[in-house]
Amino acid sequence: MDTSKGEGKRVIKLPGSQEQGEEEDDIGEDSKKTRALTPSGKRASGSTQRSCQVENCAAEMTNAKPYHRRHKVCEFHAKAPVVLHSGLQQRFCQQCSRFHELSEFDEAKRSCRRRLAGHNERRRKSSHDTH
């Protein structure tokens, strides 16, 4: 892969193909944002879901915070204790950024037990190392 640091572009040579594709870095409001070009030079189009993924929710996501747009969940359902998702009663996990069944949460917590256990383990290790 040839890289040109001055231009911020990478040229990708595909095996068995004469065409070349380019990736260009798009540095705007979010420096992590990148856009890819297809071998024909056109921008790749992704599926854009403009509403919350919870059943029967028509919340418009175009003006939502970037976090909620990225995870396709409106602010109300991200914080709701129970939502109907995929026909099941679930809750949005703040650590995983996914919906889990209610049985995976302790009481009213917003993070699933598995992720909380990992978080607590890391906390115990770091506090143990400092003593």
Swiss-Prot record:
It is found in: Nucleus. Probable transcriptional factor. Binds to the promoter of the SQUAMOSA gene. Zn(2+) 2 binds at residues 93, 96, 100, 112. It comes from Antirrhinum majus. GO terms for biological process: flower development. This is Squamosa promoter-binding protein 1. Its main location: nucleus. GO terms for cellular component: nucleus.
